[in-house]
Amino acid sequence: MAPPGRRECAFPSRRFPGLLLAALVLLLSSFSDACEEPPTFEAMELIGKPKPYYDIGERVDYKCKKGYFYIPPLATHTICDRNHTWLPVSDDACYRETCPYIGDPLNGQAILANGTYEFGYQIHFICNEGYYLIGNEILYCELKGSVAIWGGKPPICEKVLCTPPPKIKNGKHTFSEVEVFEYLDAVTYSCDPAPGPDPFSLIGESTIYCGDNSVWSHAAPECKVVKCRFPVVENGKQISGFGKKFYYKATVMFECDKGFYLNGSNTIVCDSNSTWDPPVPKCLKGYPKPEEGILDSLDDWVIALIVIAIVVGVAVICAVLYGYLQRRKKKGNADGGAEYATYQTKSTTPAEQRG
């Protein structure tokens, strides 16, 4: 019986650990008969807040996420089974929202980057040859609220057209009366007759065409008199390209007389500046200098580096060879001493050995 003035505890301290253990066992047994949180999916989400555990037979429902829509009759719910797992369920019932269909632009193509119109993907546009794109080359399928829409207007393909090519001084081009040229339309330039004794030469491309981006393929050529001076090489002779006058792109070849060598190129061409390119060569007396050797073409520091490497290599080889000879010499001395001792032993008489 408790002493007077002291209340007796309703739950003796000895019984409290036992009651706590029993409650824990009861709680664990209730968890063992339950399912953990239900599975998560990319296309659908749980309706309501998840709980830490669910009773056997308890059902949870899902709904399609934003940007997805439901297509029956596939189930969007699951039930906690007797084996404490959730019955199989998938988000195949939820489909991505899709953007409106976009066909090929006139004179072009629309290419689905991922083969689908679903949001998050893109579509590319290209134009046929002879047309160019006006607008966005790529459109993205985006969500606006819960609706999928394209992020811009589809482009259009316009025909490549060129303005007339430039007119040139002392010349003309074909189709000069045409005001608009289409893709790959070509014109050819020619020079007018010259008023003097020397003709005009056409410098540049004679034919140009309307190309991509409505730009002509080459700059317009020019017509002017190009005449190079008569090339003379002392102690040499011309062997091809003979003529009294040398106009644009005239080509001449030379060779030197016996006992002389050519200093320069043996072939020269009259360029657009009325000069020979390369310059007219010279024939010098004697014979050409021999071509420089390998060492002549190297810098001084490279040659020094090669010499140092050779010296170091020779030193290493000599050191290895010296060490090898020294070991052979020591081994020979040791073998000679042993043979001499054996010879001495064999040459002594029995009496000497006993003495």
Swiss-Prot record:
Acts as a cofactor for complement factor I, a serine protease which protects autologous cells against complement-mediated injury by cleaving C3b and C4b deposited on host tissue. May be involved in the fusion of the spermatozoa with the oocyte during fertilization. Also acts as a costimulatory factor for T-cells which induces the differentiation of CD4+ into T-regulatory 1 cells. T-regulatory 1 cells suppress immune responses by secreting interleukin-10, and therefore are thought to prevent autoimmunity. SUPFAM superfamilies: Complement control module/SCR domain. Residues 1-34 form the signal peptide. Glycans are attached at N114, T163, N263. Sushi domains 3 and 4 are the most important for interaction with C3b and C4b. One of its GO terms (cellular component) is cell surface. Keywords: Complement pathway, Cytoplasmic vesicle, Disulfide bond, Fertilization, Glycoprotein, Immunity, Innate immunity, Membrane, Repeat, Signal, Sushi, Transmembrane, Transmembrane helix. The lineage of its organism: Eukaryota, Metazoa, Chordata, Craniata, Vertebrata. The chain crosses the membrane at residues 301-321. Interacts with C3b. Interacts with C4b. Interacts with moesin/MSN. InterPro entries: CD46 (IPR017341), SEZ6_CSMD_C4BPB_Regulators (IPR051277), Sushi/SCR/CCP_sf (IPR035976), Sushi_SCR_CCP_dom (IPR000436). It comes from the Eukaryota. It is a single-pass type I membrane protein. Residues 35-96, 97-159, 160-225, 226-285 form the Sushi domain. Disulfide bonds join C99-C141, C127-C157, C162-C210, C191-C223, C228-C270, C256-C283. Residues 35-300 are extracellular. GO terms for biological process: complement activation, classical pathway; innate immune response; single fertilization. Residues 322-355 are cytoplasmic. It comes from Pongo abelii. It is found in: Cytoplasmic vesicle, Secretory vesicle, Acrosome inner membrane. This is Membrane cofactor protein.
